[in-house]
Design a protein with these regions (language model features):
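Conserved PLP cofactor-binding pocket of PLP-dependent enzymes
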Residues: 187-192
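Beta/alpha (TIM)-barrel catalytic core signal, keyed to glycine-rich beta->alpha loops juxtaposed to Asp/Glu
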Residues: 1-178, 193-200
């Protein structure tokens, strides 16, 4: 357990030596963000954030706004949930991390799919994909939020990039906000052993 100040100090030395350009953190909590930032300004924080997982809004995003730190949400498509490609009968292979995540166990997945139905209403009205709605919603939150959706297929990359052209109006954003808040996410983010490694 190395104090975060020591980590930040080492990164500061690397930046001053020209070996590193910026200091980023991942899955850090508010206390560690503040402590690290006091030693070496943090450029960006990476953590999960999407219509499916809005926990960073409670404490993380206000601190990032206060300190001028960018936010890089991973899993902005809710690990595939927000693409509309999953069903209650979806089975995940042994190499798929979702096979280990409580949110994607059969009962939890069935309950969590209620959010997809609500997002689909906006997608159909706008003539775009569910994934584009989810990414456009993130892009509309703050100019310093830059999601990093992952894909292995060119057509999905092109679809994801298309989200930058989507304009969600105030009514769309309010509808998505209400939809997201109306569905209580079932299942923990990670199994207990993995969850303990996260700084919050």
């Amino acid at each position: 357990d190395v104090p975060i100040e020591d980590v930040a100090g080492t990164v500061k030395e690397l930046i001053e030596a020209g070996k590193v350009r910026h200091f980023g953190m991942s899955e850090a909590g508010v206390d560690n963000i503040r402590r690290a930032h006091a030693v070496q300004p943090v450029t960006a924080l990476q953590s999960e954030y999407s219509l499916f997982w809005r926990e960073p809004e409670d404490r993380i995003l206000p601190v990032l706004a206060e300190l001028g730190i960018g936010f890089v949400p991973f899993s902005p498509l809710g690990r595939g949930l927000l693409t509309g490609q999953l069903t209650a009968g979806t089975e995940f292979g042994a190499g798929d991390i979702r096979a280990t995540l409580p949110r994607f166990e059969a009962d939890a997945l069935r309950a969590n799919l209620a959010l997809v139905d609500l997002v689909r209403e906006v997608a159909e009205r706008k003539g775009i994909t569910l994934g584009q709605v989810a990414l456009a919603w993130l892009l509309a939150q703050q100019p310093w939020i830059v999601p990093i959706p992952g894909t292995r297929r060119l057509e999905r990359l092109e679809e994801n990039l298309g989200a930058a052209e989507v304009e969600l109006g105030p009514d769309d954003l309010a509808e998505l906000d209400d939809a997201s808040r109306s569905v209580q996410v079932q299942g923990e983010r990670y199994p207990e052993a993995m969850q303990q490694m996260i700084d919050r």
